[in-house]
Amino acid sequence: MSMGIRLDEKFQDRRKDGIEDAFMRQAVSSAQNRLRDGRLNAAGELGDWEAFRDHSEEIRQHVLEHLDYYLYQLSENVSKRGGSVFFAETPEEANRYIREVIRSKQAKHVVKSKSMVTEEIGLNEALQEEGCTVVESDLGEWILQLDEDPPSHIVAPALHKDRNAVHETFTAHGYTGSNDPTELGRYARQELRKDFLKAEVGITGCNFAIAESGAVGLVTNEGNGRMVTSLPDTVISVMGMERVVPSYEEFEVLVNMLCRSAVGQRLTSYITTFAGTRAVGEVDGPEEFHLVIVDNKRSNILGTQFQSVLQCIRCAACINVCPVYRHIGGHAYGSIYPGPIGAVLAPLLDGYENYKELPYASSLCGACTEACPVKIPLHELLIEHRRVIVEEKKQSPFVERIAMKGFAVTASSPFLFEAAEHVAPFATSPFATSGQIEKGLPAWTDSKDLPQPNKQTVRDWFKKRGNA
């Protein structure tokens, strides 16, 4: 199962679409500036931000090194709270289990809170095939669902839209008001409330699951997570297998880092933890709770040179500083995980066949690594991906392989190298104008200057200087 957005289009075409979308680029640029500045201000309030990053990295590394222990502890405590736990190796297994739960309830209306992993496994499409109406309750995700538009950002999925675009979408679905944000928000609240009240099943993601208690933690700004977990009689939470913490102590640290890194807030409006089924005497909460823990090739990443990518807490700080994302937007990546984290993660989860271009969609400036609150060496992992693509997978472009082999032969022979230096000015003349190569290599010359080789070589120049 592919988790791509538009894999029927080549990356070069998606990239071009993004670059040529002036409105999207302006929206992304403004959002990046706002989110980046907010993160820096919020981080400064903590004092020694680097110490917090070090501690957060230690927490995530410790969990990954002892993941089997904490997942077992989590599953035991969920069961003690009356919940059911299902370990899904593949997206198909996860979707099949969730469909069976919904089928057993004869449910037709499902409401969801924001969840990257459910998008990763294609859950909405699987449930719609079952005949269910699935409603996203996160405002940004709901807007995109109405517009049949994929998300472009991990934290702010509708980042590429402004209020006029939202107004146009709402109007197409019966809205008659203005484009005032308050009025738009009121309409969304009224419509979503109807879905909350008639939903038979609620589905959530999981920011962090707490092993010592069996609780699931949700971080939201809209309160939709609490509605999804308190109103339906059946609640299903879906989590990537790495999204577990030992205790509330570590949960507190990572939530603090998540909120400040994602949106520049000390805390989001709602930090929700819930565990198991409704207890005797409680008036809300589910009568039935299921926790689906998804592998989807994560276990293949453990113990490899890419293991540190599983430290990710999905804050999107790397995306908010990435110059490539700034120019091409999220849709160009063809994955629900865009930006630097997507360029590292997508090939691991869905194969180099689909995403071998993404590791090259980077300037390797290292801004992503500096911004990451859990210190994932993202730019180093991108370089490692490139090495794997070229040396192990042998998937570099054919022309590039031939060119590199030819250069290796030429550069290792003084005679051939000197001959090439003298031939190059004449060989490139048909493609050059005023000393600049302008044809034949569009991937380079469309965005960079490429001077024509000089007729006087360095060796010739040196000989003349030496005789002077």
Curated annotation (Swiss-Prot):
[4Fe-4S] cluster 2 binds at residues 322, 365, 368. Keywords: 4Fe-4S, Electron transport, Iron, Iron-sulfur, Metal-binding, Repeat, Transport. One of its GO terms (biological process) is lactate metabolic process. PANTHER family: LACTATE UTILIZATION PROTEIN B. Residues 442-468 are annotated as: Disordered. This is Lactate utilization protein B. GO terms for molecular function: 4 iron, 4 sulfur cluster binding; metal ion binding. Residues 457-468 have a biased composition (Basic and acidic residues). [4Fe-4S] cluster 1 binds at residues 312, 315, 318, 372. Belongs to the LutB/YkgF family. It comes from Exiguobacterium sp. (strain ATCC BAA-1283 / AT1b). The gene is lutB.
